[in-house]
């Protein structure tokens, strides 16, 4: 794998990112905007699943746009994250905090969309098991947020 990561660092995209502070800053800012969209939408969706937000709206009315926003935020963050990763692929891939961040990202997204696709979305009210799923989902998203912050601060 190290040879793959070393090769990634030699690509023109990786070199351009590594050699431009302005490009790195712009990509980082856009990456954080995408992450903010993901986290805000996940918070909104899961608070609704918990029954703690927007009682006048059905779960489906809240989850549909929130899930779309999560997907847009993920697309933004994954794209910019890949560009940022390319510049330092070898070092970043060996970083345990980064590895945990990627594991939590995959787990949180998979869990969120697996739970969000269930049929309770179409029923009125919030089922008790849906509340439990929302609590787990929120925990995963917040663990991701803390780990992402740790990666930024400790890197």
Name every feature range the model reports, one short phrase each:
Residues 1-155:
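Polytopic transmembrane helical bundles with strong interfacial aromatic enrichment
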